[in-house]
UniProtKB/Swiss-Prot annotation:
Known role: Ketoreductase; part of the gene cluster that mediates the biosynthesis of sphingofungins, bioactive molecules acting as sphingolipid inhibitors via inhibiting serine palmitoyl transferase (SPT). Sphingofungin biosynthesis starts with the PKS sphB that produces an C18 polyketide precursor 3-hydroxyoctadeca-4,10-dienoyl-ACP containing one delta-6 desaturation and one delta-12 desaturation.
Organism name: Aspergillus fumigatus (strain CBS 144.89 / FGSC A1163 / CEA10)
Induction: Expression is positively regulated by the sphingofungins biosynthesis cluster-specific transcription factor sphG.
Reaction(s) the record says it catalyses: 3-oxopresphingofungin + NADPH + 2 H(+) = presphingofungin + NADP(+)
GO (cellular component) term, any one: membrane
GO molecular function, one term: oxidoreductase activity
Gene: sphF
Region spans: Disordered: 1-21, 275-298
The keyword Manganese is annotated on this UniProt entry: no
Taxonomy, superkingdom: Eukaryota
The entry's keywords: Membrane, Oxidoreductase, Transmembrane, Transmembrane helix
Usage in biotechnology: The sphingofungins A, B, C, and D, show a limited antifungal spectrum of activity but are especially effective against Cryptococcus species, fungal pathogens causing opportunistic infections in human.
Enzyme Commission identifier(s): 1.-.-.-
Name of this chain's protein: Ketoreductase sphF
Highest classification ranks of the organism: Eukaryota, Fungi, Dikarya, Ascomycota, Pezizomycotina
Membrane topology: Single-pass membrane protein
Length: 420
C-alpha cells in the first residue's frame, strides 16, 4: 500500500518543517500582508468616488486649464445646478483649492475643470428632448416640444429681466449667463474657449451702440427681445422688441467693427453701406437694400473667400412633422446678406412684396459662419400671437454645400469635429 507523500505546509521551513504561525518566514509574510490590508482598508473612504462616477458617465478631462491634476469632486453637479438656479450668479458652494472647480457642463454632458475666474463659463444646453438634466431638473420642458419654452430657465416672467439668459454667440445652440462686471463670458467648448474671443468685456459703453467688444444677442424668452452687453453692468443693458411691422430689429446705427482674426468683418465700406437709408424695393431688403456692385461681384467671383463674411441663406420653415435637417427651398429665392451691422433682417410674416409670402410664421434664425462652423451671430424672432414650430436656418458654404441645419435638437450634441 502506497503512502501519501507528505508536503511541507505553506509557510513551513523546508529544513525543520516549522508550522505556520511560529517564528519563521511564514509569520513574517503574514504580518506584512495583514499590515498592508489594514492600510488599504483605512484608505478606502478616501477613494475619489466622484471621479469614479464621472468616469462611469463618460469621458472626463482630468487636467485643469492650468495643467494641474486634481482628483477632488466635492461639488456634485446636482448641487452646483441648484446653486446656479437659486443664486443666479454662478457662485460655487465650495472652493476647491481656491483655483479650480469641477462643473457639469450640460452642453455635452461632460465634467469640465473651471478656474474660479472662469466659473461663469458653465453652460447649460437646450433640452434636446434627450432627458438631459438642466438647471431646473429632469422635469424641464423641451423647447421643441413646448413651442419655444426654454429648459431650466424658470418662469417666463424672469427671462427678460436683468441678468437673464442669453444665447451664446458661438452658434452651437448653447446658453450663456451674463455675469457681473464681466459682460459676456467666453464659452468653454471642449475644454477650450471659442475659436475667436468675441465675448470680451466692452472697452467702452454707450447706450444704443455696438462697439468692438459689445455684441448683440437674442434673449431666449421667445418674445423677440434683443439685449446689448454693457461694461460693468449686472444686468442686460437693454431689450428691444422686434419691429413687427417691418420684421427686422431696430439695432443701433453703429456697425460691427473688424475683430481680431477677421470674425465679424465689417469694413468701413460695408458699415457705411449698411447705415444708408434706402427705401425698400422688390430687389432689396428693407434693412440692407442691395449690396454695392463691387461687393456683389467680389462675392460672385470668389465664392470660397469666407474669411470674414456672414453668408446667410433663407430656408423654408420647419414643420411639426419634419425631423431631419431640411434643405433650402428650391422655389424660394436665396440671397446672401451681409449682416455687418445696422438693421438685421428677420423674415416671417406674409405680406405684399415679402419674399416669404405664404410661408408659415415662426422662429427664424440668422447665422453667420466661418468655414464650416456656425458662428458669431444669431437673432431670433417669434410672433407672440402665434407660436408655431421652430423654423430652422442653415448656413451655406460658397461652393453650395449646406453645412447643416440651425435647429437646437440637431446641434446640441456631438458638435466636435463635424459640420452642424
Amino acid at each position: 500500500m502506497l503512502e501519501r507523500p507528505s508536503f511541507p505546509r505553506l509557510g513551513a521551513g523546508t529544513r525543520h518543517h516549522r508550522p505556520l504561525g511560529q517564528t519563521g518566514e511564514g509569520s513574517d509574510w503574514l504580518l506584512a500582508f495583514t499590515g498592508i490590508s489594514g492600510i488599504a482598508g483605512m484608505m478606502i473612504p478616501y477613494v475619489p468616488w466622484g471621479l469614479i462616477r464621472a468616469m462611469q458617465r463618460g469621458s472626463i478631462e482630468l487636467t485643469s486649464p492650468r495643467g494641474v491634476w486634481i482628483f477632488n469632486c466635492a461639488i456634485l453637479p446636482s448641487r452646483l445646478h441648484r446653486t446656479v438656479e437659486r443664486k443666479g450668479n454662478m457662485k460655487p458652494d465650495q472652493d476647491l483649492f481656491g483655483k479650480v472647480y469641477l462643473a457639469d457642463c450640460l452642453c455635452d454632458r461632460r465634467l469640465r475643470w473651471l478656474r474660479k475666474s472662469d466659473f461663469q463659463h458653465t453652460c447649460c444646453a437646450w433640452c434636446q428632448c434627450h432627458n438631459i438634466r438642466t438647471t431646473a431638473g429632469p422635469s424641464s420642458r423641451c423647447p421643441e416640444r413646448d413651442r419655444g419654452e426654454l429648459c431650466g430657465c424658470g418662469p417666463a416672467r424672469d427671462r427678460c429681466r436683468g441678468g437673464g439668459y442669453g444665447r451664446c454667440l458661438c452658434g452651437v445652440g448653447r446658453i450663456q449667463i451674463p455675469t457681473p462686471n464681466r459682460g459676456f463670458p467666453v464659452l468653454l467648448r471642449g475644454g477650450k474657449p471659442c475659436r475667436e474671443r468675441v465675448f470680451h468685456r466692452s472697452s467702452s459703453h454707450a447706450a444704443g451702440f455696438l462697439h468692438e467688444e459689445q455684441l448683440l444677442f437674442h434673449c431666449v424668452c421667445g418674445q423677440g427681445h434683443v439685449g446689448y452687453l454693457g461694461r460693468g453692468r449686472q444686468e442686460i443693458s437693454r431689450h428691444r422688441r422686434v419691429d413687427q411691422r417691418h420684421h427686422w430689429t431696430q439695432t443701433p446705427k453703429d456697425c460691427f467693427r473688424q475683430q481680431r482674426g477677421g470674425v465679424l468683418g465689417a469694413t468701413r465700406e460695408r458699415c457705411l453701406y449698411a447705415r444708408q437709408k434706402r427705401s425698400p424695393s422688390p430687389g432689396r431688403h428693407p434693412a440692407l437694400g442691395s449690396p454695392p456692385a463691387q461687393l456683389r461681384q467680389d462675392h460672385l467671383h470668389n465664392p470660397h473667400r469666407l474669411s470674414s463674411r456672414l453668408h446667410l441663406a433663407w430656408v423654408r420653415p420647419r414643420t411639426r412633422h419634419q425631423t431631419g435637417p431640411h434643405e433650402a427651398d428650391p422655389g424660394h429665392q436665396r440671397r446672401h446678406f451681409r449682416a455687418a451691422g445696422g438693421e438685421i433682417p428677420v423674415l416671417g410674416e406674409s405680406g405684399p412684396g415679402d419674399r416669404c409670402a405664404g410661408r408659415p410664421r415662426g422662429f427664424y434664425y440668422l447665422r453667420g459662419f466661418i468655414g464650416c462652423e456656425s458662428f458669431v451671430y444669431e437673432h431670433g424672432w417669434v410672433e407672440p400671437q402665434e407660436r408655431t414650430w421652430n423654423c430652422g436656418f442653415v448656413v451655406e458654404r460658397g461652393d453650395g454645400v449646406v453645412c447643416g441645419a440651425g435647429v437646437e435638437e440637431e446641434v446640441g450634441e456631438d458638435v466636435q469635429g463635424r459640420c452642424y
